[in-house]
Curated annotation (Swiss-Prot):
This is Chalcone synthase 6. GO terms for molecular function: naringenin-chalcone synthase activity. InterPro entries: Chalcone/stilbene_synt_C, Chalcone/stilbene_synt_N, Chalcone/stilbene_synthase_AS, Polyketide_synthase_type-III, Thiolase-like. The active site is at C164. GO terms for biological process: flavonoid biosynthetic process; polyketide biosynthetic process. It comes from Pisum sativum (Garden pea). It catalyses: (E)-4-coumaroyl-CoA + 3 malonyl-CoA + 3 H(+) = 2',4,4',6'-tetrahydroxychalcone + 3 CO2 + 4 CoA.
Length: 389
């Protein structure tokens, strides 16, 4: 008779979870940050709020963002004026948009990832879908399964309203699934659409205005699996270790609440300080077992919540400016896409590493870290091992 331990051993993969493909997608509508304040105050009928507009212009100028992509066009906003007020009841209109657009954008990214992977989609065993918007039943995971034509018995996991740390969460879950289910191939999708958070300006709630200056739309997809098939599957990064923690004394630092007026965001000014104060502890826990204490010797992927967070982390750890190059590039070209950001940065890093003729996918280095920061304040940590190019 076969023992339970023998069954468990047979169920487990031998090697670490590996990212085998990455795909990204954005809406077609591109918004230039330099002209966005004019557009935003005009479309929300707020041009008379000149002092507030000047504040918003300064926020956009300091954001280090060049452009963002948004599903919400001028035409859509004119057809849905309730979205342009500060707190007008508008949830129905928002929901009608995102329940369609979130899976659609996710499909676009997933198709690219599956194409790079090079295997038939029938080999996908698990699906993890993550989005901050559009809670619905059946969920976006179900809709994507139908849109892609995946097998009906794909094992699905749906994550709603986790926010900006969740790019790390999906990697942690994918790692556990791939390593504990021999032969598993996990499709991971993060799809974020800001139609649920867009609203007009308020003189009294400037933290809402910060979100309007930073957030953009985008979707990213990965294929994750252990024990890659030689000559068929091409590893990009290996996931070695993961952790999640709630930063002490951080309650209320980042909050989001679903209301009749959509999803409202609330930020404390000291979010960059809270993150930078707790980052060293997370790094020690992650890299002490590897005997690494020089954090300039590893590659960096950090959720770009905004430039102030990156600046303070750099200063606290004495990081060289080039450490955050891939992270800042994605912030500049796409804005803050919540959970999808760190996956975009993974893609940016492996592509630039190959283009520059470096020896590994991680900017020529062997070890790296990926951080997600978001509501809670929650910190996700993923230790990555790069792959030779």
């Amino acid at each position: 008779m076969v023992s339970v331990s023998e069954i468990r051993k047979a169920q487990r993969a031998e090697g670490p979870a590996t990212i085998l493909a990455i795909g990204t997608a954005t809406p077609a509508n591109c918004v230039e940050q330099s002209t966005y304040p004019d557009f935003y105050f005009k479309i929300t009928n707020s041009e008379h709020k000149t002092v507030l507009k000047e504040k918003f212009q300064r926020m956009c100028d300091k954001s280090m963002i060049k452009r963002r992509y948004m599903y919400l066009t001028e035409e859509i906003l004119k057809e849905n004026p309730s979205l342009c007020e500060y707190m007008a009841p508008s949830l129905d209109a928002r929901q009608d948009m995102v329940v369609v657009e979130v899976p659609r954008l996710g499909k676009e990214a997933a198709v690219k990832a599956i194409k790079e992977w090079g295997q038939p989609k029938s080999k996908i065993t698990h699906l993890i879908f993550c989005t901050t918007s559009g809670v619905d039943m059946p969920g976006a995971d179900y809709q994507l399964t139908k849109l892609l034509g995946l097998r009906p018995y794909v094992k699905r996991y749906m994550m709603y309203q986790q926010g900006c740390f969740a790019g790390g969460t999906v990697l942690r879950l994918a790692k556990d699934l791939a390593e504990n289910n021999k032969g598993a191939r996990v499709l991971v999708v993060c799809s974020e659409v800001t139609a649920v958070t867009f609203r007009g300006p308020s003189d009294t709630h400037l933290d809402s205005l910060v979100g309007q200056a930073l957030f953009g739309d985008g979707a990213a997809a990965l294929i994750v699996g252990s024990d890659p098939l030689p000559e068929i599957e091409k590893p990009i990064f290996e996931m070695v270790w993961t952790a999640q923690t709630i930063a002490p004394d951080s309650e209320g630092a980042i909050d989001g609440h679903l209301r009749e007026a959509g999803l409202t965001f609330h930020l404390l000014k000291d979010v960059p300080g809270i993150v930078s104060k707790n980052i060293n502890k997370a790094l020690v826990e992650a890299f002490q077992p590897l005997n690494i204490d020089d954090y300039n010797s590893i590659f960096w992927i950090a959720h770009p919540g905004g430039p102030a967070i990156l600046d303070q982390v750099e200063e606290k750890l004495g990081l060289k400016p080039e450490k955050m190059k891939a992270t800042r590039e994605v912030l500049s070209e796409y804005g803050n896409m919540s959970s999808a950001c760190v996956l975009f940065i993974l893609d940016e890093m492996r592509k630039k590493s190959a283009q520059q003729g470096l020896k590994t996918t991680g900017e020529g280095l062997d070890w790296g870290v990926l951080f997600g920061f978001g509501p809670g304040l929650t910190i996700e940590t993923v230790v990555l091992h790069s792959v030779a190019i």
